[in-house]
């Protein structure tokens, strides 16, 4: 099996297991419905898993959510070890995913410059339908 393919499969499986573990985590401060693990990146030696977290809320709430998850990373690592057949379960590190926020800012800048990609796409589709 291609090593890159295996790594991608492991990352995907870890992401699914983390979502399951999140539902079992008992922390009243954590708003589970608004937390999403957007991506998981395994290190080459598979000892570390960097997990990027998306969260709807204020910047303070997002920072607090990442801190709560980092405090519970032992719980997540144990859950992965019990459910995934690996020699060593990777150490989990949670980070705030700023990709969505950055894409919204880029979109806002484009709109300010007079270019709205969404409207242009709709306009092109309408033009194709008229032809």
Curated annotation (Swiss-Prot):
The keyword Transmembrane helix does not apply. GO terms for biological process: maturation of SSU-rRNA; ribosome biogenesis. This is Ribosome-binding factor A. It is found in: Cytoplasm. The lineage of its organism: Bacteria, Thermotogati, Thermotogota, Thermotogae, Thermotogales. GO terms for molecular function: ribosomal small subunit binding. HAMAP family: RbfA. NCBIfam families: rbfA. Belongs to the RbfA family. It comes from Thermotoga maritima (strain ATCC 43589 / DSM 3109 / JCM 10099 / NBRC 100826 / MSB8). GO terms for cellular component: cytosol.
